[in-house]
């Protein structure tokens, strides 16, 4: 019998990114590569998988020079597992899907304020993962994440459970004007609230509105990545606050019970 393990990293674990801006100016690309591998190996030892066995989608809002239809997903198969270090596997998609035949292969995404959602069909033991920040919510990636399970596994909505990872919460995510990325009006209805000339953005509710599954099947991390000193936060980085800069990771993998 398999079980799904869901985990998150934070700044206590180390930087889950190869972006040069997170490392000392003196670091070469090889220095970054080696430091990053050590972090992944340490995380793998902590949770019980190989740090070389982590896959994430190459998302068009996140990576450069990518395009594909909204909601594109990839079901993990043997062709995705050919490289020794799977972090360097490029899979252009919004969503990754994996079944319980693939054990100890992590699917997830790095993030530093954006929610990552993990949707599990517990009956059919199939899992879908997507990075669902504001841009992705605007183009309905959470909805497509559920749809990927329905298309790939014939999932019943009543069998799907969702985890919404640690992210910036409404009290912290504030604009002084209506955000120009919020172009899909129906998506943001009642999720962007104006208070005293400031706009408070509720990413979590906007995600939940797209899932269409029983509310008691949804687990939400209580962590606000901006306020919690243990988590990397993009907003904190932009504001040049005192927190360390970097990226967290939210992922899931199957293992034997």
List PLM regions with ranges:
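Active-site microenvironment for binding and transforming phosphate-containing groups
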Residues: 1-257
